[in-house]
Structure formats: structure tokens, C-alpha cells
């Protein structure tokens, strides 16, 4: 078996990636989220496949087909709620994975980091289109509001929006194409994940100290396979608890009402995992400015390798930047809260302050803190 594992052209690839892969001996549970994201993607593709067997992407039957899945299909309710809450688990793991990368300076592996940003955009696009498919009130109005943002692009904006809609409003053509894209994108994401791993295995994993770990590597299997398995069990337990006990806790009550173009919901808002970006979008009075800020809220991550001023890689031994980091985390939680609030005083002002703070911490304060820490080290 050992000979086959190391010689067979296909099994050899798996062996080098998941079995004999030299891994730092000191990586903590924060390094579990990569494998958990792989598990989330697998769950989403499988549950999505079974949902697609019963779903119809037609405006007149989409809503009732989802109701049919929940009422008449064997365990359809479970598949639907695993898929809906699986998306939430996916984003929780994504945010923790990115947060770990920022904290421990993993963004210095530029190819892997940039691939991760592309993946983040792809997953966000997939989740947005998936939210439109049940064709409830929030699905319809969410799709209308978010796609309409593209009309802010000078000269070609309006034409572009109508091209995406397939008409003069969000309608049958829009739903059909969103379903097609929502189906194909997870497979594209799977291919991108393989590229992400390819880049990662070129450099090897980072570790909590931020030091070179070549002198102290251990094989991935059995040490980290068993560790990842424990993480997977905890993730599945959490997902099952969500899907079975609180299936609609993270959803919007408006989505229990079929889409009606003549009736606008009082507060249009996306799913909870987009609220931070939605708050940044709404905090700028200008439409184009808001769209740019929305894109930059994610794209600013690509600047992190160039804004790294410290002589140390991670934040493990850097108390000033650590403080900045946790203020940034708190700021993102505030933005998430604001994104779900109505557009009125004092929420508008809080959103604007939190949005300015978000970009200021990443672009200005963290690099300055890194330089201050360098000087303190030099003095000693």
C-alpha cells in the first residue's frame, strides 16, 4: 500500500497533499477552518444538488416549489434547512479563516492570499444568487436593490443592469440565469480551492509564531487528520442544531411572503453575513461612492501584504497592533448590527463612524502600530 500511495500518479497527489504533507508541529485550532470550509462546500454542493432536483426556476412556481420541497419531498425540509444554514456556517468559517490570516500575517503568502480573496468574492456572489431563488419578498427586493447598484457605473451602468436582468426589471429571465449561475459557481469555487491549496503547498503553512518551521515539521496524517475530524464533528453538531432547533433564526420573515413587485418591504436587507458590507454601502450618500466602498471593503484585504510594516510576521508578540486588531473585530460587529437597522438617526451616524474606522484601522493605524513596535524593539 505504501508503494502504491507514493507511486500511483493520482494517489500520489492526494498523498502529497493530505497524508505525507510536512506540517508545522505547532499550528493551533485556528488552522482547522480551511478543512471546515472544504466540508461546508461539500455539504452545500450535495444538499444543493438534491434541492435542484425538485426546484423550478420560474417566477410562477419557484416559491411553491420550495414549499413543495419542505412539505412533500422525503426529508426535503432537512435538506433545505441544511443548505440555508450551511451557508451561514460557511461564512462563519470564512470570516474566522480570514481573521486568522490577518492575525498571524498569513497574507505574506501573496499568491495564496489573493486566491483566497477571489474565492471570497466567488462565495459571496454564489450566496447572493442563492438567496434570490426562493422568490420571497426579500429575495426579489434584495436582487432588485443590489443589482441596481451597477447602474451607478458611468455611461454603461443602465445598459449593464438591464443586460443582467434580461429585461427592464427583475423577472423570469433574471431568476433563470441566477439559478444557472448559482448551480455552476460552486464547481468553479472547487477548482479555485484546488489552486488555493496548490499555492499554499508551494510555501507550506504559516504557524502561530510566524517563524520558519522547516526545522520542526510533522506528517499531516494522522496528527492533523484526527484534529480536523474533531473540528468537522463540532461543525456538523452546530449545523444540525441550527437546522433542527432554530431553522429560521438567521432568515428573514419577509421571505415567507411570495415576491410582489408592487409591494416594497419596510426594510430591505441582505442575509446577516453581508450586513457589514451593506452598512458600509449605505453610509455613503453618493451611489457610486457607496458601490466603490462596498467593493473596497473586501478588496482592502489585497493591500495587507503591502501595508505590513512590522519586522514580525504575526500579532502574537505585538500588543499595540493586537489592540488595533480587536478594535477592528468589534467595529465589524457594529457594522453588522447597523446593516440590519433602519436608515435613520442615530444609526446613519454610527454606520458612518464605523465605516471610516474600518478603513482607517486597516490602512493607517495598523501599519503605524507596526512601525512603533519596531522602534520599541530597536530601543531594547
UniProtKB/Swiss-Prot annotation:
Gene3D superfamilies: Cytochrome Bc1 Complex, Chain C. Binds 2 heme b groups non-covalently. Its main location: mitochondrion. Disulfide bonds: none annotated. The chain crosses the membrane at residues 33-53, 77-98, 113-133, 178-198, 226-246, 288-308, 320-340, 347-367. Heme b b562 binds at residues 83, 182. One of its GO terms (biological process) is mitochondrial electron transport, ubiquinol to cytochrome c. Keywords: Electron transport, Heme, Iron, Membrane, Metal-binding, Mitochondrion, Mitochondrion inner membrane, Respiratory chain, Transmembrane, Transmembrane helix, Transport, Ubiquinone. A ubiquinone binds at residue 201. It comes from the Eukaryota. One of its GO terms (molecular function) is ubiquinol-cytochrome-c reductase activity. Coiled coil: none annotated. CDD domains: cytochrome_b_C, Cytochrome_b_N. Its cofactor is heme b. It is a multi-pass membrane protein. One of its GO terms (cellular component) is mitochondrial inner membrane. It is found in: Mitochondrion inner membrane. Pfam families: Cytochrom_B_C, Cytochrome_B. Heme b b566 binds at residues 97, 196. Component of the ubiquinol-cytochrome c reductase complex (complex III or cytochrome b-c1 complex) that is part of the mitochondrial respiratory chain. The b-c1 complex mediates electron transfer from ubiquinol to cytochrome c. Contributes to the generation of a proton gradient across the mitochondrial membrane that is then used for ATP synthesis. Belongs to the cytochrome b family. Heme 1 (or BL or b562) is low-potential and absorbs at about 562 nm, and heme 2 (or BH or b566) is high-potential and absorbs at about 566 nm. This is Cytochrome b. The gene is MT-CYB.
